[in-house]
Curated annotation (Swiss-Prot):
It comes from the Bacteria. The keyword Metal-binding applies. Keywords: Metal-binding, NAD, Oxidoreductase. PANTHER family: 4-HYDROXYTHREONINE-4-PHOSPHATE DEHYDROGENASE, D-THREONATE 4-PHOSPHATE DEHYDROGENASE. Its EC number is 1.3.1.53. GO terms for molecular function: (3S,4R)-3,4-dihydroxycyclohexa-1,5-diene-1,4-dicarboxylate dehydrogenase activity; metal ion binding; NAD binding. Involved in the degradation of terephthalate (TPA) via the protocatechuate (PCA) 4,5-cleavage pathway. Catalyzes the dehydrogenation of 1,2-dihydroxy-3,5-cyclohexadiene-1,4-dicarboxylate (DCD) to yield protocatechuate (PCA). Belongs to the PdxA family. GO terms for biological process: phthalate metabolic process. This is 1,2-dihydroxy-3,5-cyclohexadiene-1,4-dicarboxylate dehydrogenase. It is an enzyme of class 1 (oxidoreductase).
């Protein structure tokens, strides 16, 4: 069955992690025609080493590749280094630019290692922040949406303390996240999603028993979204609404509200989309797995599902 119909850019992520390996393993499962629609970005040396470890040297012969990101040879599997962090950003940036210029239709990036990127002196809080910076957007305009196990969960806030998230949350930020997610649902074949907005506090504050945040932030956002003609329920307790599984799109206020259910139900099969910009970028719902890098045992399931998700036939 053909799963790739769109042109995709595939950045290999941290070259010292499992990115090069899972990229090759996923590509091996595609037909030659499908592989011809995917351009790989990253250090060729890391791909060569991964191919040797996985005995996939023949796959490199028809790989469409663009060198992006400098890397000392050989790759230092499992090592967290500034050079690998810089390479991660360089390869992802090149892929984003290719999409922005119309060379490809969407971008997929293998896992990064945040510490390596910070050691390179680069401000970074995940692929959404990188996408925003490359496109010249405010970071508040790009959101993370996890897709897996039949769930689609957009995050209004992401990699920050709970205190910082509460200070930043506003009705408009919630509205912007939902608008971006609804547009993305259309791209994914769900044009009129039923939306559920999680409360900030337990039980969506139980009236105002557990705080004023939901009456001041999420409830006004829901009212605005309904006036725009969207089918939105909430705010509701995340535990209750997820148990019901009646909605197409869920809106998490905080990182763990969205990550825990996805990682519980789809530990190796989730996609992580950065949405809200003119370029759609997706990574996978797991990390760079430095502890198993270079051993040939990494699972490419999540990456293959992400390729299928973004490579699907439009409409």
């Amino acid at each position: 069955m053909t799963i790739v119909h769109r042109r995709l850019a595939l950045a290999i992520g941290d070259p010292h992690g499992i990115g090069p390996e899972i990229a090759l393993k996923a590509l091996q499962q595609l037909s030659a025609t499908e592989r011809s629609l995917i351009k790989v970005y990253g250090p060729w040396s890391a791909l060569e080493q991964a191919a040797q470890i996985c005995q996939m040297e023949s796959l490199l012969q028809d790989l469409i590749h663009e060198e992006a990101g400098s890397l000392a040879q050989p790759a230092q599997w499992g090592e967290i280094t500034p050079q690998a962090g810089l390479s991660t950003v360089q390869s992802a940036t090149a892929a984003i630019r290719a999409c922005e210029n119309g060379e490809v239709d969407a971008v997929i990036a293998c896992p990064h290692h945040e510490t390596a990127i910070h050691r390179a002196g680069i401000a970074f809080s995940g692929y959404p922040s990188l996408l925003a910076n490359v496109l010249g957007m405010n970071e508040d305009e790009v959101f993370l949406m996890l897709v897996g196990a039949g769930l689609r969960i957009v995050h209004v806030t992401l990699h920050e303390s709970v205190r910082s998230a509460l200070e930043r949350l506003s009705p408009q930020l919630v509205v912007d996240a939902v608008d971006a997610a609804v547009q993305t649902c259309t791209l994914l074949g769900v044009p009129k999603p039923q939306v559920a907005v999680f409360g900030i506090n337990p039980h969506a504050s139980e009236g105002q028993l557990f705080g004023l945040e939901d009456s001041q932030i999420t409830a006004p956002a829901v009212e605005t979204l309904r006036k725009c003609g969207l089918a939105v329920d909430g705010p509701m307790g995340a535990d209750m609404v997820l148990a019901q599984r009646k909605h197409d799109l869920y809106v998490a206020m905080l990182h763990d509200q969205g990550h825990i259910p996805i990682k519980l139900l789809a530990p190796n099969g989730a996609s992580a989309l950065s949405i809200g910009g003119r370029v759609v970028l997706s990574s996978v719902g797991h990390g760079s797995a430095m502890d198993i890098a270079g051993r040939g045992v990494a699972d490419s399931t999540a990456l293959l599902r992400t390729i299928a998700l973004l490579g699907a036939q439009p409409g």
